[in-house]
């Protein structure tokens, strides 16, 4: 989701929400709970004793069912740890800044820990040719605003995930094109 957090005649700054979305918290929690259940039942089948009273493993033979449940439980817990770390590190969060004073466009995002944790891409505002809007309807709809930049590939500005409504896409693209004084392509 893009929030227009700073608006003036000379600087436009849009905040971009990263991985700290409600849906990510939901899926990380569901995967952790489900994987924990699988792992507990798998271990219970090995021990021939119910570790948790409401998760009975009396009818489950350890080889192959309990072993497979342990494997899926372990894999699910690893996936859940990855999801929780992504949320903790807030991967994908950042901003798009369009600065007429200095003549710069700055696209900033937080990445995974390491030497490239801070993703900071800067372009000259004069290199922006247009704002391109891509709209694909169907089973997997896609609605993205791109910054068309001279000499490089188009830079996506909208978030990944739940697509924005047509009205929101049009309003954001129009506001950005008006600010940058460039054309809109694709609408």
Swiss-Prot record:
It comes from Mesostigma viride (Green alga). The keyword Plastid applies. NCBIfam families: PRK02542.1. One of its GO terms (cellular component) is photosystem I. InterPro entries: PSI_Ycf4_assembly (IPR003359). Seems to be required for the assembly of the photosystem I complex. The gene is ycf4. The chain crosses the membrane at residues 25-47, 62-84. Belongs to the Ycf4 family. It is found in: Plastid, Chloroplast thylakoid membrane. Disulfide bonds: none annotated. The keyword Cytoplasm does not apply. Keywords: Chloroplast, Membrane, Photosynthesis, Plastid, Thylakoid, Transmembrane, Transmembrane helix. It comes from the Eukaryota. It is a multi-pass membrane protein. This is Photosystem I assembly protein Ycf4. GO terms for biological process: photosynthesis. Its main location: plastid. PANTHER family: PHOTOSYSTEM I ASSEMBLY PROTEIN YCF4 (PTHR33288:SF4), PTHR33288.
